[in-house]
Regions:
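Serine/threonine-rich, low-complexity intrinsically disordered segments
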Residues: 6-7, 14, 47, 52-53, ...
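Intrinsically disordered, low-complexity segments enriched in small/polar residues
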Residues: 5, 24-27, 41-42, 52, ...
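Amphipathic alpha-helical segments
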Residues: 10-31
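Mixed-charge, Lys/Arg-enriched low-complexity segments
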Residues: 7-10, 79-109
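Amphipathic, interaction-prone secondary-structure segments
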Residues: 24-28, 33-68
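Asparagine-rich low-complexity intrinsically disordered tracts
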Residues: 2-3, 14, 70
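Intrinsically disordered, low-complexity regulatory segments enriched in Ser/Thr/Pro
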Residues: 56-92
Length: 109
């Protein structure tokens, strides 16, 4: 199991709130990362927390936990690999996820 934690920091909590709302709205988007297509299959939200679960074509599962605190959104991804590699899936997924959400915000909103 590979785990990575990072964060997005915004200038104000208004921007963080807006981006958090975008994630809630577009939580069902697929994420392509490192040649794998991650498809969402579970979504849970409670106050300032969002938990998303994804699976891919290799029967791997990934859990993304997002927590908003003021102008920062903490993101933790946990990948359950069938064959544990170097741990990069978890890190690259967060980057790919951010890109998908930013695209959704700027292209759809």
């Amino acid at each position: 199991m590979n785990q990575t934690t990072t964060y997005l920091e915004f200038k104000t909590d208004l921007f963080a709130n807006t981006f958090f709302d975008v994630i809630k709205k577009y939580h069902d988007y697929e994420v392509c990362c490192e040649g794998k297509l991650w498809v969402p299959f579970s979504y849970f939200t409670h106050e300032n927390n969002i938990t998303l679960k994804y699976s891919n074509q290799h029967d791997e599962e990934l859990t993304l936990v997002l927590e908003k605190k003021n102008e920062r959104i903490n993101a933790t991804s946990i990948v359950k690999n069938k064959y544990v590699e170097d741990g990069t899936d978890a890190f690259y997924f967060i980057d790919a996820f951010q890109e998908v959400m930013f695209d959704a915000y700027f292209l759809k909103e």
